[in-house]
UniProtKB/Swiss-Prot annotation:
Keywords: Hydrolase, Lipid degradation, Lipid metabolism, Transducer. InterPro entries: C2_dom, C2_domain_sf, EF-hand-dom_pair, PI-PLC_fam, PLC-like_Pdiesterase_TIM-brl, Plc1_PH, PLipase_C_PInositol-sp_X_dom, PLipase_C_Pinositol-sp_Y. PANTHER family: 1-PHOSPHATIDYLINOSITOL 4,5-BISPHOSPHATE PHOSPHODIESTERASE BETA-4, PHOSPHOINOSITIDE-SPECIFIC PHOSPHOLIPASE C FAMILY PROTEIN. Residues 1-109, 128-164, 742-780 are annotated as: Disordered. This is 1-phosphatidylinositol 4,5-bisphosphate phosphodiesterase 1. Residues 43-66, 86-109, 142-155, 743-778 have a biased composition (Low complexity). Residues 131-141 have a biased composition (Polar residues). GO terms for molecular function: phosphatidylinositol-4,5-bisphosphate phospholipase C activity. Residues 566-726 form the PI-PLC X-box domain. It catalyses: a 1,2-diacyl-sn-glycero-3-phospho-(1D-myo-inositol-4,5-bisphosphate) + H2O = 1D-myo-inositol 1,4,5-trisphosphate + a 1,2-diacyl-sn-glycerol + H(+). Its EC number is 3.1.4.11.
């Protein structure tokens, strides 16, 4: 994501040491280089995109952000600790000469734990963090110290840049205010206790930023609360204080480079570093409304040129691109994705903000993996260094020595974690468990300790608590995996480790992994050696690490034996398609934005829709900040909009630039641009020029094989743009080819087909207008029916392989041209499916030619239809509203799972092979095929457990532990015959989901609930194999049965059955908008008949 940080993270370690030695200045004066570090030594990703990986080669769903947050907390040291650097050894040598005499391991652990407790004094309350004042002035504390992180990898430690941690906050159990001196910590310690430094401006006054939207440009103050990973901002006002007799005439308070302030209100003006300091401008809050989101809500971030599509859409000058930040996040109150476009005042502020976000993300991932490290893994030198770096300051703010007299300083040093500390850790890590359960574990550890050697700690000021060894016991009990233990017991049969042959049997016979080309067992041996323990075999932890790794991904991939998968003609594929791609909300009053194109392309969409209209000649171009082009007219400039509705237009040129930029990042296969032309001939000329200028040689403007009468394959059109546009030439000179298709002769006549259009029906097939216009919402601005503009030849001729023609009849010669494409509304195709004769013709047509189906214009809220009936009849492009994550879109994304197909799915052979001619025209070939060739598929699914499930979506229950249960649904089958088991079916929620069963409710445990519920039976299906599995995680207000309370869906996963591998698998879940929940997963066992895979493998 943050590609621009790569070079900043490459600063050498010597420079890092110099920065750390000169770290006494204020955070606001820090050098930008001090704000960046890379915990792994590798450059960060190009996008902070919290979705599943789109690349098959890079897909590692659980390896990077593991729900098993305690995987690194071990009781025994299993690896040799890294050795300190020469400089560290020198520091240790000098410090050890003045250290105390106690060097035993037990006292060492206690003292380290004491230091950690003093460090961990951050609050979870953002208001509390701002209320802390210093002793001498009453102003917010701005003095914060630097923790120098020694970055470690798997092989050797590396020195990293200093990172800024938030100011010291009040501890919930003490009135004492602790000050920290500069220390050195290994990053595992700092991160495991949740510490990170950020510039103090984010926790004190807030960073001034310029917020850009379609409606306005406003100044805001931006805060970050690192204790709970929260971002917040408020609108700001400016006040000016004169500090000298000479007052600067400069009034611009905009980011550097902005000279045109006509688009900004007076409240948006503050000073910048470039302005003379004779007048001091300060920001104040204009209202009490606070906008906020947390780190986990962020879906993607675009910085600088990555966000050029948004910047151009908002008419912001390119000179401000270097300070541009776009944050896409989920707004819980509005239950939708929101875009936050920001411009920093200068380069330094930009680096501060980006660094803070990146470091918080790294910390969040680290906390989710580790929670707290095992100090036994620290080498002795690091232990001594920690002991001799005193964390506790005296009353005068100076360090008195290695040991501080608590009675003199009136500071109370704790060597334990209270139960309140445990709750704070749980809240920070989103451990969604009943408080009573945590209390029981807490008391259990205390009881075990009192029965052995140690007694519970108790002081007059603090309640009883756990020392470090006891806390490790607490974590061990909390993370205990009974489900994994049962699997291990069944495999090991009493053994402590498993050897190679046993692991090979597990991988091949239980996990059903296909290693047919691994004759020498080299692949399996590589996996075995990677997770071997010290006993030269696999233990229980080895097994879990393998199940969580990329070697155990739950989804199948195209194997090397399927190298010809993309070599078939385009008409033999299902193609991932979007309807009204430019919309981010409803059809009537939603926003139009390039964001719609960016998001769909990032998810693998291969056919996007662009509705092109004339720009309004009565208005001028929106003022571009930083330019002087205020008087340029927008007449005849093509715009993208949803007709004459309340949606906002966007520039066609900006749309094409954004499409080109993101077109082939996720998928290399051809992208179809479906153009809907509603503009004048003059504007169409500009459309042609824009397409050619921006797309260049990547756009298909001539057949790649002029003699071919079949469509080319995706492999032949790799990285190419295909234009789909209406054909203007009449079909009067068609030549029939040998295979029955028709092609046009070289001589063409130019005529134009005119159609009518209304605001409710703006797509290709206008036959829906009659039925749609009568049901138009009163919210739409009505206009006279005008004839659609004529499509000029220059534009029509760009439709090389996807010529849009109006459907009249399947038997006409124009319906047999190899490169035509029918576009039908859902009402039209539904009528065809109900007619037996038309259904046969529909199936026959779609075996050889292209068709696109789109939702009705009466779906004012951009809802979706069920795409399964249209796929079952071979429709290649079933366009859905991607901005609405309902069942239709869930099925659409499940079919085109990016990790596997990247937007192109080869249709089942039964939908590609030519149909046999029947002696009777009344025979329904599909009905006959379904009756004689149905399949019975045995299945056995076991939902074993869940991990870090989301919290209640309602504010009324947000602080309560959830009562989760999971529904299991089979979609697309003719029938399902369930085996008898303890789970009872519940009534279907929709007509497309007739077969649902549920697990039992687990009381107040969303952290690691064990469901242990099996679902087995037989699926009766046709040979098209369009069978899908849907998991929905619910949070219930009832403790026993769903019918007794409210049930809130909190996570969803829909996948095609034969995409799933068998065996034990971790499956990541999506939120209600289809975005992956990075830390939430379910652990399941999958079994079904191998016969179902034959169609998938042997296509």
């Amino acid at each position: 994501m943050l590609e621009s940080l790569n070079r900043r993270n490459s600063i050498d370690s010597n420079q890092a040491d110099n920065d750390n030695d000169n770290d006494n200045h204020s955070n606001d004066e820090l050098s930008p280089s001090e704000l960046y570090y890379s915990p792994s030594g590798s450059p960060p990703k190009s996008q902070l995109l919290l979705r599943k990986s789109s690349s098959p080669s890079s897909y590692s769903p659980i390896k990077s952000d593991l729900p098993n947050i305690y995987s690194h907390l071990r009781s025994n040291d299993s690896e040799s600790p890294p050795q300190p650097s020469p400089k560290q050894q020198s520091s240790l040598s000098s410090s050890s000469s003045s250290s105390s005499s106690s060097n035993t391991k037990s006292s060492t652990t206690k003292n380290i734990f004491k230091k950690l407790l003093r460090i961990n004094k951050s609050s979870d309350n953002i208001d509390e963090s701002r209320s802390i004042v210093s002793n001498n002035g009453g102003s917010p504390m701005s003095d914060s110290t630097t923790v120098t992180s020694t970055l470690s990898t798997d092989t050797a430690p590396k020195r990293g840049k200093s990172i800024q941690r938030s100011q010291i906050l009040h501890h919930t159990d003490s009135d004492s205010l602790y000050l920290e001196n500069q220390i050195e910590l290994r990053p595992e310690i700092s991160k495991s206790i949740g510490n990170i430094k950020i510039p103090s401006i984010f926790t004190n006054d807030g960073m001034p930023l310029l917020k850009i939207s379609h409606k306005s440009k406003k100044r805001i103050l931006f805060w970050i609360d690192p204790s709970c990973f929260k971002f917040s901002w408020r609108m700001a006002n400016s006040t000016t204080t004169t500090t000298s007799a000479t007052t600067s005439a400069t009034t611009s308070g905009l980011p550097q480079g902005i000279t045109n302030t006509t688009a900004l209100s007076n409240s948006a003006i503050i000073s910048t570093p470039a302005i003379a300091t004779s007048a001091i401008h300060r920001l104040s809050i204009t209202n009490r409304t606070t906008h906020e989101f947390v780190l986990d809500d962020i879906k993607s971030i675009y910085i600088q040129n990555e966000g050029s599509g948004y910047r151009e859409e908002l008419n912001i000058s390119q000179k401000l691109e270097k300070n541009w930040i776009t944050i896409i996040y989920f707004n819980h109150k509005k239950n939708s994705l929101k875009s936050l476009h920001l411009i920093t005042d200068n380069d330094h502020d930009f680096k501060k903000l980006i660094s803070a976000i990146y470091n918080l993300k790294q910390l969040r991932s680290q906390l989710a993996k580790e929670f707290l490290i095992d100090l036994n893994e620290l080498d002795e030198n690091y232990v001594k260094m920690l002991l001799n770096k005193e964390l506790l300051a005296g009353d005068n703010g100076n360090v008195d020595g290695n040991e501080v007299d608590i009675r003199k300083s009136h500071k109370h040093v704790r060597e334990f974690l209270s139960f309140n500390d445990i709750l704070k850790y749980s809240k920070r890590l989103n451990i969604n468990v009943n408080t009573n359960h945590l209390q029981q574990i807490f008391d259990q550890v205390l009881l075990l300790s009192s029965a052995t050697t140690e007694k519970p700690v108790s002081t007059p000021l603090f309640e009883k608590g756990l020392n470090f060894e006891q806390f490790k016991q607490f974590v061990s009990i909390l993370k205990d995996r009974k489900d994994l233990q049962e699997i291990w017991d069944s495999l090991a049969q009493g053994k402590e480790v498993l050897q190679f042959d046993e692991i090979k049997n597990f991988i091949i016979n239980i996990q059903k992994e296909n290693f047919s080309d691994d004759d020498d067992n080299s692949t399996i041996n590589l996996i075995f050696q990677k997770y071997c323990s010290n006993d030269n075999g696999w233990n229980k932890e080895s097994l879990n690490e393998y199940l969580l790794s990329s070697y155990s991904t739950p989804y199948r991939e195209i194997t090397q034996t399927q190298t010809n998968y993309y070599d078939y003609p385009l008409n033999e594929y299902f193609i991932s398609s979007s309807h009204n791609t430019y919309l981010t909300g409803r059809q009537v009053a939603g926003d139009s934005s390039v964001e719609g194109y960016i998001r769909t392309l990032q998810r693998g969409c291969r056919c996007v829709e662009i509705d092109i209209w004339n720009g309004d000649s009565n208005t001028t171009t929106t003022t571009v900040i930083g330019t002087k082009d205020d008087d340029d007219k927008n007449e005849y400039e093509p715009i993208v909009n949803h007709g004459r509705t309340f949606t906002k237009p966007i520039s066609f040129a900006n749309v094409i630039r954004a499409i080109k930029k993101f077109a082939f990042i996720v998928s290399p296969w051809p992208l179809i641009l479906s153009l809907e032309i509603h503009c004048s001939p003059e504007c169409q000329i500009k459309v042609v020029n824009i397409l050619k200028d921006i797309l260049g040689e990547n756009m298909i403007i001539a057949p790649i094989d002029i003699d071919s009468v079949i469509l080319p394959s995706p492999a032949e059109l790799k990285h190419k743009f295909i234009i789909k546009v209406k054909k203007t030439t009449s079909f009067q000179n068609l030549i029939e080819t040998e295979n029955g298709s028709f092609t046009t002769s070289t001589t063409t006549t130019t005529t134009t087909t005119t159609t009518t259009t209304t605001a409710t029906s703006l797509s290709e097939d206008n036959e829906n207008n009659k039925s749609n216009s009568s049901s138009t919402s009163s919210f739409i601005i009505r206009r006279r029916k005008n004839k659609s503009p004529k499509i000029i030849n220059e534009l029509s001729n760009l439709g090389i392989y996807t010529q849009g023609i109006k459907f009249r009849n399947f038997s006409l010669p124009e319906s047999k041209t190899f490169n035509h494409c029918f576009s039908l509304g859902e009402k039209s195709i539904n009528r065809m499916i109900k007619d037996d004769d038309k259904k046969i013709s529909l199936d026959k047509h779609n075996r050889r030619y292209l068709m696109r189906v789109y939702p009705s214009g009466t779906r004012l809220k951009s809802s979706n239809f069920n795409p399964l009936p249209y796929w079952s009849h071979g429709v290649q492009m079933v366009a859905t509203n991607w901005q609405t994550y309902d069942l239709g879109q869930q099925l659409n994304e499940a079919l085109f799972e990016n990790k596997i197909f990247q937007g192109y799915v080869l249709k089942p052979s039964v939908l590609r092979k030519p149909t046999l001619k029947s002696s009777s025209s009344n025979v329904d070939t599909r009905t006959s095929l379904t009756t004689t060739n149905s399949k019975t598929i045995r299945f056995n699914f076991e939902i074993i457990s869940g991990h870090q499930l989301p919290k209640f979506p309602k504010d009324d229950y947000k602080d309560q532990a959830i009562n989760p249960y999971i529904s299991f649904e089979i979609i697309g089958a003719q029938d399902v015959q369930w085996d008898n088991n303890d789970s009872s079916p519940i009534a279907p929620t929709t007509s497309s989901s007739p077969f649902i069963r549920t697990t039992k409710i687990i009381r107040e445990n969303g952290f690691n609930p064990n469901f242990n519920t099996k679902f087995s039976g037989s699926i009766i299906t046709t040979t098209n194999d369009l069978i899908f599995i849907k998991f929905v995680v619910y949070a219930s207000t009832s403790l026993n049965y769903p019918d007794y309370g409210e049930n809130f869906p909190i996570a969803i996963l829909v996948t095609k059955l034969n995409y799933l591998k068998q065996g034990y698998r971790y499956i990541y879940l999506n939120d209600l908008l289809g975005e992956q929940l990075v830390y939430s997963s379910i652990f399941i066992k999958i079994e079904y008949d191998e016969d179902l895979l034959n169609e998938f493998i042997n296509k």
